[in-house]
Amino acid sequence: MTTLRTAAQLCEHGFVAPERQKIIETVTGRYAVAVPEALAGLIDRNDPHDPIARQFIPDAKELVHRPEDLADPIGDDVHSPVDGIVHRYPDRVLLKLTHVCAVYCRFCFRREMVGPKKPIQLSPAKLADAIKYIRTQPQIWEVILTGGDPLILSPRRLRSVMKSLAAIDHVKVIRIHTRMPVADPKRITADLVRAIKVKRKPTYVAVHINHPRELTQQARAACARMADTGIPLLSQTVLLAGINDMPEVMEDLMRALVECRIKPYYLHHGDLAPGTGHLRTDIGRGQDLMRRLRGRASGLCQPIYVLDIPGGHGKSPIGPNYLTQREANNAAIIEDFKGVQHRYPARQR
């Protein structure tokens, strides 16, 4: 099976009913579709609510746009001084090397900006301008490679970018955001791992994983190839209705990540991307999940539940608040993971 990209191919392989092909063609004409073999093989065609299918198989509900939906929900454009750069926070920038992915998630917050009709990679001139911008901004401590998926690029291309960034003295950390270990595990070759690991500058890889079934033996092996060379691995997970918003699924996912040497980093509240409302939950649901996870799983398994404030105002943590109140004398009332309240005395002066 090759990567599935059209409604006809999805019908042929049993992921879309023939009577729905026409409406799905409308969706695929609006938003990019790519379902690689590694993920298509995980889908249970007999389960109409399969969590893998909900992430990657297009749905007519994507044509429903809500008043709150935004083409650029996290405000990338507001903070883009040059093509390819998003400079939202003082000490770090995003470097968007490509607008192409191995798989297109149905909830993607950059769905208006990515796809096969977009440039595969920044042109040499635009990349040079982006590197120049980083070089001339001494407050930039970390560069985050994103896109699209930067690991869709060749090891040669990645090696060149990493070398250029590593040569900038004030850049101390390089981070890569990717779906590739689960979307196409065989692409994580020894050559690619060597390309992204540079001397004297730590490289972190944040792997996007939303459901424990994505951590196949092949995906685990791909992650191990990076971890075995000393590359620290983090995870990014999006809270998604009907996919991972069940306590047992979230717990299983976080435990599986830690077992794979991947530290859970962010649990993202769904962004206001067009046509994704059916996959978003409310904030209270996410807080309940985090509260339950706190009581049942190791601290290693705890991600930070965050929301990207629309308009480009950055991430804010929105997890449950265990400090429920303060008394008149400044003593605190703290709630434990069971919901029981306890008094913590004020500091005596």
Residue ranges: model-predicted function:
Residues L39, C105, Y265:
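Conserved, mostly hydrophobic/aromatic
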Residues S80-D83, V93-K96, A128-Y133:
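Short, charged beta->alpha transition segments
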Residues H87-P124, I176:
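Canonical Radical SAM [4Fe-4S] cluster-binding loop centered on the CxxxCxxC motif
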Residues D288-R349:
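C-terminal accessory regions of radical SAM enzymes
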Residues L95-K96, C108, V143-L145, P150-L151:
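Conserved catalytic-core segments centered on acid/base and nucleophilic motifs
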Residues M1-H87:
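Flexible, acidic/Gly-rich N-terminal and inter-domain linker regions that tether
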Residues G84, K118-P119, R135-Q137:
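Domain-level signature for proteins that mediate thiol-based redox and metal-cofactor handling
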Residues L127-E142, L151-A297:
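Conserved AdoMet/S-adenosylmethionine-binding subsite of the radical SAM
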